[in-house]
């Protein structure tokens, strides 16, 4: 019999700073994440999900599919994003998961009107930073505020703007329930509120390690069990997170980044 700690999937990272690595995600990692999101994003039996994401990363393969499956709601799956087809489907769905370019392309379509969106409960964005101007333009266009969230291959979803409450452009919101986030310096010391450092995380969503790479796995975790994301971030006094870049992609000039 399979248990929560048994490996359910190996999903390969994008390999931003080297060769791609196979992140081992357990049944517990995936189920805990989906159940948390179903509650956090308020899914009910009345929802219908529109899914036009590619299924080679966690957003499309796990987050969207698992939320629909575990809540038992219909999902309209499109093999690829097409503005005209999304517009045709919108009248029969209540939730859409997308990436920022989906929303900019929709706003360019003449048939994507404010009236078309009035029944929509939620537009979710992730997988790439949502520009503040896109957030504001979409609200002006539709009257709906996109909910931005943050995740990665090694932990699926990690943080989210609130369903109820203020969604601030340029931020990814707060740690998911059960997930602990901290922003640290190179010695893994927590930085002061508002200062930039590397985002670290611990929780039931965090993967079991990299496939056949024990040394790499060990180097990516702190002694107290936090995964070192490699993403540079800030956190305010309320715990709201802003992603500002990648650790290894920073350009240092005159000692400043």
Residue ranges and their predicted role:
Residues 1-12, 19, 42-48:
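Conserved pre-ATP/AMP-binding loop-to-beta segment of ANL
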Residues 7, 13-16, 49, 55, ...:
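Conserved S/T- and glycine-rich ATP-binding loop of Class I adenylate-forming
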Residues 8-32:
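Conserved AMP-binding A3 loop
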Residues 21-24, 51, 73-80, 147:
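Short beta-strand->loop structural element characteristic of the AMP-binding/adenylate-forming
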Residues 31-48, 56-95, 105, 109-111:
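Conserved AMP-binding/adenylation subdomain of ANL enzymes
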Residues 93-98, 107-168, 180:
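Gly/Ser/Thr-rich phosphate-binding loop
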Residues 127, 151, 173, 231, ...:
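Active-site glycine-centered loops adjacent to acidic/histidine catalytic or metal-binding residues
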Residues 189-194, 198-257:
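Conserved ATP-binding/catalytic segment of the ANL
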């Amino acid at each position: 019999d399979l248990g929560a700690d048994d490996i359910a999937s190996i999903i390969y990272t994008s390999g931003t700073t080297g060769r791609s690595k196979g992140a081992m995600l357990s049944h517990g990692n995936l189920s805990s994440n989906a159940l948390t999101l179903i509650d956090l994003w308020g899914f009910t039996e009345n929802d219908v999900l529109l899914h036009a994401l590619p299924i080679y990363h966690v957003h499309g393969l796990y987050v969207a599919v698992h939320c629909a499956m575990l809540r038992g709601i219909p999902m309209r799956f499109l093999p690829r994003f097409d503005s005209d087809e999304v517009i045709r489907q919108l009248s029969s769905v209540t939730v859409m998961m997308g990436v920022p370019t989906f929303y900019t392309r929709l706003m360019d379509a003449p048939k994507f009107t404010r009236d078309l969106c009035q029944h929509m409960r939620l537009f979710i964005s992730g997988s790439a930073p949502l520009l503040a101007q896109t957030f504001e333009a979409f609200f002006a266009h539709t009257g709906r505020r996109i909910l931005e969230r943050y995740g990665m291959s090694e932990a699926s979803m990690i943080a989210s703007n609130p369903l109820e409450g203020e969604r601030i452009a340029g931020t990814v919101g707060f740690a998911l329930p059960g997930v602990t986030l901290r922003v640290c310096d190179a010695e893994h010391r927590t930085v002061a509120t508002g200062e930039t450092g590397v985002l670290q995380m611990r929780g039931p969503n965090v993967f079991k390690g990299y496939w056949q790479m024990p040394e790499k796995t060990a180097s990516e975790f702190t002694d107290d069990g936090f995964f070192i994301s490699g993403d540079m971030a800030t956190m305010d006094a309320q715990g709201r997170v802003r992603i500002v870049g990648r650790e290894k992609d920073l350009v240092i000039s005159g000692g400043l980044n």
